[in-house]
Curated annotation (Swiss-Prot):
The keyword Transcription regulation is assigned to this record: yes
Disruption phenotype: Mutant animals die during gestation. Premature death starts around 10.5 dpc. Severe morphological abnormalities, such as enlarged tailbud, kinked neural tube posterior to forelimb buds and reduced tissue mass in the interlimb domain become obvious at 9.0 dpc and thereafter. Head and anterior body structures, including the developing heart, appeared normal. In the trunk posterior to the forelimbs, there are no identifiable somites or segment patterning, although the anterior-most somites appeared normal, with decreases in somite size and disruption of myotomal patterning in somites 8-11.
Gene that encodes it: Msgn1
Name used for this protein in its record: Mesogenin-1
Gene Ontology CC entries for this record: nucleoplasm
Functional note: Involved in specifying the paraxial, but not dorsal, mesoderm. May regulate the expression of T-box transcription factors required for mesoderm formation and differentiation.
Entry-linked Gene3D superfamilies: Helix-loop-helix DNA-binding domain (4.10.280.10)
GO molecular function: chromatin binding; DNA-binding transcription activator activity, RNA polymerase II-specific; protein dimerization activity; sequence-specific double-stranded DNA binding
Organism: Mus musculus (Mouse)
Length: 188
């Protein structure tokens, strides 16, 4: 770090000694124990119409500094003249409420996962019951179909059972209608 400082000092062609000392002090980040604040220096330092980065320097202020800032005890305030914000870095040390307990976040997520598993089980049970009821109804339909519609030695599939049932009902309807009236046209 000393070599860097010496190298930096040798490059100070256009800077006066007060600028160099302030610039080097800003590099010493390890020695700062207090929060930092940006403060605009006098406008004579910058010739550009808009403020530039060179016209700001870091100044260490105690937390809750009320000198030029307006703001409450929340650690935030604004400078009226420069329009800058003071930030209380002690606010960064807080932990969110869900991290205060050792397994806080994990516990919340665990209960959510448990709810999800429980809901899936209930949905699975409802689906099983629905499929069982449907299978019973199809089995009853197969029992009412005449043996002509059944395949030899193999049970009918669900779709075959429904198609043959519709066809059988159509034939029965035709039989009833033909006893005194004309036959009903077959639909495909």
């Amino acid at each position: 770090m000393d070599n860097l400082g010496e190298t930096f000092l040798s490059l100070e062609d256009g800077l006066d000694s007060s600028d160099t000392a302030g610039l080097l002090a800003s590099w010493d980040w390890k020695s700062r124990a207090r929060p930092l604040e940006l403060v605009q220096e006098s406008p004579t330092q910058s010739l550009s119409p808009a403020p530039s980065l060179e016209s700001y320097s870091e100044v260490a202020l105690p937390c809750g500094h009320s000198g030029a800032s307006t703001g409450g005890s929340d650690g935030y305030g604004s400078h009226e003249a420069a329009g800058l914000v003071e930030l209380d870095y002690s606010m960064l040390a807080f932990q969110p409420p869900y991290l205060h307990t050792a397994g806080g976040l994990k516990g919340q997520k665990g209960s959510k996962v448990k709810m999800s598993v429980q809901r899936r089980r209930k949905a699975s049970e409802r689906e099983k019951l629905r499929m069982r009821t449907l299978a019973d109804a199809l089995h009853t339909l197969r029992n009412y179909l005449p043996p002509v519609y059944s395949q030899r030695g193999q049970p009918l599939t669900k779709i075959q059972t429904l198609k043959y049932t519709i066809k059988y009902i159509g034939e029965l309807t035709d039989l009833l209608n033909s006893s005194g009236r004309e036959p009903r046209p077959q639909s495909v």
